[in-house]
Amino acid sequence: MDSLNSILSAISAVVWGPFILIPLLLGTGLWLTIRLGGLQFRALGRATRHVFATDSDDESPEGDISNYQALTTALAATVGVGNIVGVATALSIGGPGALVWIWITGLLGMASKYTEAYLGVRFRTTDSKGEMSGGPQQYLKRGIPGPLGSVLAVFFAIFAICASFGIGNLAQANAVATNMESTFGIAPAATGAILFVLVGSVLLGGIQAIGRITAAFVPLMIIVYVLGGLYVIFSHATEIPAAFAMIFSDAFTESAAGGGFVGSTIMMAIQYGVARGIFSNESGMGSAAIAAAAAKTPHPARQGLVSMTQTFIDTIIVVTITGLVIVVGGTWDMDRDEAGIMTAEAFSRVLPGDWGGTIVSLSIIFFAFSTIMAWAYYGERSLESLCGRKASIPYRMFFACLLFVGSVSELELAWTFSDLANGLIAIPNLIGLFLLSGLVARETKAYLAFDPKLNKPVDEVRAFVESQGMDWK
């Protein structure tokens, strides 16, 4: 295992180094921000309206789930272990300054998330069962002419399947098993068996079942965790200004060693901030476009705006809560091998009894469970794009069995594999976003000119779509 982890770490270091993924992620996000005229900043308020829109005023018959369910499914995939353990890992290696780079990745990533969700709906198709099928595997192949698009689509599908086993399975199952053992004394093998049964049962219901469950549980999970985090932060109210000063200072200077912290460079802050940022919000990975493609929406821009809010909620709200809890709680300089308990320790120092550790442990368990379900859908859709519907059942069976492996395996290997898979899945998608940015910018501009307040009735929007010759349904 150690030799395998070393090999994967070496490859991951190259992929996530200063010459490949970091400039590609930040550069594409900046480029899309410019092409879309800072859409993530000027339309965020209007986009929020569509998150809570009712079926009658914002949805069209085409699609499998509501736009709200598409958002919560995407949130289920992103608001997971990365928001708690991932952020702690970034701070333990990159220092408090890594949080700034997570924010930058998130803000620029909102433009990427809008673009990939837009394209997910724009190029979606209907499969043999009458369900919507979309995502990078569709818009890369159908949107980019020539063999390049097809090649990128195949690579994305392969890497997405790998990512579903990493970020969506091994890392999540390991986190659940670790917390079940530390909090409730349940053996990892028993947790693996429970996950196998629960996830397997949900997967039998497909995207509709996943959408219903995430719509019910994800908002509640986020609210409980955020409220607990805010209580911890304001219990250290006098230390908040110093915490922000440290965060911004360390983002652009080297962090000195102290406690269990061995020090970090600016490059480490950037590398781990960006890596954990994408692990948290998945902007640029293309995964959320698969859920967006299943949404009932009269125009791609509407779902793009809804999906864009997911990155804001995930990174600017939930990740910020975790980061501030760790910094003001004084646990960020613990030994990096203890990154998994940094957040719980910060909670426990403020909340009475075992409440702190229990809240964090339960949050990790429920966040991870919802992430597993969403990524099972992403991986299945990606495999179907290569092998057809016949591959669905074997994939679900293997995915469920792998949860047991993740529950009893080493955390370091699970995270290393997840980091590498995240990087590989993003590369073909980011290339596609760059090449298709002109199409998205042009059609978004036309739509916002037609519906600047984003409140046109569905029938008028559909008539506009037809007048533009957009054959996207």
What are these regions (language model features)?
Residues 1-81, 91-98, 109, 404, ...:
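N-terminal alpha-helical transmembrane segments of multi-pass membrane transport
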Residues 3-4, 36-40, 83-87, 164-176, ...:
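Transmembrane helix-loop junctions in multi-pass membrane proteins
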Residues 24-28, 32-48, 156, 173-180, ...:
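Membrane-interface loop-to-helix entry segments
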Residues 28, 32-33, 105-130, 141-174, ...:
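Helix-loop-helix module between adjacent transmembrane segments
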Residues 38-65, 89-99, 103, 111-148, ...:
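Flexible loop linkers connecting adjacent transmembrane helices
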Residues 57-93, 119-137, 141-143, 158-161, ...:
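Alpha-helical membrane segments and immediately flanking helix-loop junctions
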Residues 108-116, 193-207, 218-238, 271-276, ...:
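Selective recognition of specific alpha-helical transmembrane segments in multi-pass small-molecule
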Residues 116-124, 228-246, 254, 258-260, ...:
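Extracellular/periplasmic helix-exit of transmembrane alpha-helices
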